[in-house]
Amino acid sequence: VGLGIFAYSGGPYPLSYHGLGDVAVLVFFGWVPVVTSFFILRGTIADPTLWQLATAIGLSSVNILVVNNYRDAEEDRKAGKRTLIVRMGRDFAPRFYLTCGLLSLGLLYPIYSFWGMLLMLPYIVLFSATHRHLQFAEGAELNKTLGKTARNVFFLALLIGAMLLLKG
């Protein structure tokens, strides 16, 4: 994860300045920690369920960056930071946020099916409310959206853990 932070903002080709920050978050906050933890515990990375879970967490984490880049779009543009939101326009952010959230949930459904997904209802309600807030918030109000999005990522991780325990 430390290497990811360096690659995101430093080095000869900072990913955040070239519209690749979202990919970096998916990799370094989804795939790397989840797959590494699984490998340490199980000694393999060949389980397709593992990659679905890692991608679901990663996409959920991307939404933190989406809100941050949405809030800072004008400053980023002036600084020459070509984030995905700067490249695609501010109207893209709420749609991308929704897409990441829906893909995250979609990756979980085949693993847990209907009954396991019932556990996700509170998350879906929180995610929907946060997405709605993102659509209408401006400036410093987006700091609240950022905090709610971080809460949602944490809550999703807890729910995935609960579903794993129930699945046995």
Give residue spans per PLM region.
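Membrane-embedded alpha-helical segments that form the functional core of polytopic membrane enzymes
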Residues: 1-6, 46-67
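Transmembrane helix-loop-helix
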Residues: 1-10, 99-141
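Intramembrane alpha-helical segments
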Residues: 1-45
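Hydrophobic residues within alpha-helical transmembrane segments
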Residues: 20, 52, 99-102, 151, ...
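Small-residue-rich segments of transmembrane alpha-helices in multi-pass membrane proteins
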Residues: 23-38, 57, 86-90, 147-161
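Helix-coil boundary and interhelical linker segments in multi-pass alpha-helical membrane proteins
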Residues: 33-54, 106-116, 161-168
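Solvent-exposed interhelical
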Residues: 58-102
